[in-house]
Amino acid sequence: MSNQFLDLITKRRTIYAIGKNIEQSPERLTDLIQTAIKQSPSAFNSQSSRAVILFNTEHEKFWGIVADKLKSYAKDEASAAKTTAKMASFAAGVGTVLFFEDQTVVQALQEQFPSYADNFPV
């Protein structure tokens, strides 16, 4: 690995104040995400990782649904308010990426490699 890459990883920081001030278009972000998923190594080269990429109203709608559901689990008003504020901070961003594993690929691997079948579901 190049020192430049390792330096970038070392200097990386989480941004907590999420906002909509980005330089890339949604199309460019989608392309970057799709490329990263496609080029990421996977067990048995299964390429089973998938992503749903949400922008604009779909992104905001998603976080509204999550906030409503999580509020129903809150023990009191203070907890509900904290949860609502946290979900609002996520909704303040440009988009959301939801990662998942394609279970049809996993099932095919279980059939193709029966001796490893119990190890595939993650």
Regions inferred by a protein language model and the residue ranges of each:
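Glycine/small-residue-rich phosphate/adenosyl-binding loop
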Residues: 48-122
